[in-house]
Amino acid sequence: MATGTPDSQARFGQSVKGLLTEKVNTCGTDVIALTKQVLKGSRSSELLGQAARNMVLQEDAILHSEDSLRKMAIITTHLQYQQEAIQKNVEQSSNLQDQLNHLLK
């Protein structure tokens, strides 16, 4: 059995070398694409974590605002009671002043 001519062996070697180079380039491209995807996924994870932290901060701010609104409602109620008391005192002082004027006449 003849193994072939040196010329055909050289062409076969070049063909194999070309296929191997093509496969290596394809694998390199795939590795680069995979690396980009992993980095993108890592960045997405970071962004998701940051969004979660921001949401917690916003929730705390909302809870603090609700607490402040409750306190302001209580203060408003107390101020209304004080206003009513002052108004009654003004009316009574006006009546007392009228009575005093009537007595002094």
Curated annotation (Swiss-Prot):
**Keyword terms, alphabetized:** Lysosome, Membrane
Subcellular location as annotated: Lysosome membrane
Q: Does this entry carry the keyword Membrane?
A: yes
User: One Pfam match, by short name?
Assistant: BORCS7
Primary localisation category: membrane
Key word Nucleotidyltransferase present: no
> Which GO CC annotations does the UniProt entry carry?
BORC complex; lysosomal membrane
* InterPro entries in the cross-refs: BORCS7 (IPR032143)
Protein function: As part of the BORC complex may play a role in lysosomes movement and localization at the cell periphery. Associated with the cytosolic face of lysosomes, the BORC complex may recruit ARL8B and couple lysosomes to microtubule plus-end-directed kinesin motor.
- Give the quaternary structure: Component of the BLOC-one-related complex (BORC) which is composed of BLOC1S1, BLOC1S2, BORCS5, BORCS6, BORCS7, BORCS8, KXD1 and SNAPIN.
Family statement: Belongs to the BORCS7 family.
- Its recorded name reads BLOC-1-related complex subunit 7
Q: Which gene encodes it?
A: BORCS7
